[in-house]
Amino acid sequence: MHIRYQQLIAICLALMFAPEVSAYENHQMWDKVRVGGKLCMKSHEHHGQSPLWVSKKGARAYSRRAWERFTTWEYGKAWGKLRLAAGRRERCVQTGKRWMCSIIARPCRPWRRRRRR
């Protein structure tokens, strides 16, 4: 019984930390293209959406944060900055007195030259 408990703990710890390690490698499965001083995903887009919000400004801010949080979680901090994203499209819709906004963009990160050894 004691061994099973230790195995269960080991499995739980592995599951907790495995996504964090692999999250930074997820970007390698997508084709990338250089756009100015940035490296961008060629065709892979991320979405951020707000729930119904009292103000348009609040809904836009929420959708932008949602995009940045998910992209940062999946690819790391370098890829999760909306101001660097390419092909950005935002749309807000008013339903009654409330607003809902969504944003779609391709993640980019600053271009870094690889050092020659």
Residue ranges, per PLM feature:
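Domain-level marker for long, solvent-exposed, non-transmembrane regions
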Residues: 21-117
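Bacterial N-terminal signal peptides
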Residues: 10-16
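Bacterial N-terminal signal peptides that target proteins for export
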Residues: 1-9
